[in-house]
Amino acid sequence: MESPPLYEISSSSSSEKPRHHFQSLDLFPNLNQNSCINNTLIEPLPLIDRINLNSNLDLNPNPLYAEEGEQEEEEEEEEDREVDVDLHIGLPGFGKPSNDAKQLKKRNGKEIATYDAGKGIENELSGKAYWIPAPEQILIGFTHFSCHVCFKTFNRYNNLQMHMWGHGSQYRKGPESLKGTQPRAMLGIPCYCCVEGCRNHIDHPRSKPLKDFRTLQTHYKRKHGHKPFSCRLCGKLLAVKGDWRTHEKNCGKRWVCVCGSDFKHKRSLKDHVKAFGSGHGPYPTGLFEEQASNSSVSETLFF
């Protein structure tokens, strides 16, 4: 009896078992192996930032030099953190700004940023910026305004502004277009006095900056400068012309209270009356003398 063909056996077995239990026959094993190898070769390389640099590969040929460089960078970062900002700005006409214009200092725990020749003033006005001008700068003041294009100087800022208009239309777009030529921004910076021992000196334990450059000029003239004005009545020397006029006007006058106290200045008498209240007031004779002096002045004007 002849054996049945193989395909009949497979057909009968396929009817008994479901098809998904069959294992697919690999008719070309060598070809499949080659395709897997090709697929592995075609895969893209990993990104550089995902490479593990802590592996056993020695990527640094000179490790000692690298460690020294890292230590130096860390020391520089620590020094930058310790020192921050002081301010010492020069006048626009006193020399050209240099590349090393900014200098860092630290005094008595106060951080200051120093600037030379007024460089970088426009960008550093915000925050706690201030100025410590030299005596020559205080006495001379802003008498020369310099053009940053041709370095021509002018005695007035308005003349400098008109001169800048001649350099091009880019300087005619309002005050913002003239940045770098305006010394008015410097005038508003708080200032410290440069005289040691002064209460407004930066090293004084109770130091306090003056409001602006003009206030510093008046302070320096009154406290540390030459006093050319002399009172013709008492001979007192004064440094500021306005103070001299006020002093001479009130020199020799005494403002008397009814309680018997007398004062040099009228405002002192007013403060006295305001502090003690009832029972105090200006002495009537002083008022009569003031009225008599006013009437004599009016008579001299009309006759």
UniProtKB/Swiss-Prot annotation:
Sequence segments annotated as region (Disordered): 1-21, 61-82
Source species, domain of life: Eukaryota
Mutant lacking the gene: phenotype: Lack of flavanoid pigment accumulation in the seed coat endothelium (transparent testa phenotype).
Major localisation: nucleus
Coiled-coil regions, chain positions: 66-84
The UniProt record lists the keyword Coiled coil: yes
Protein name, entry field: Protein TRANSPARENT TESTA 1
Organism of this sequence: Arabidopsis thaliana
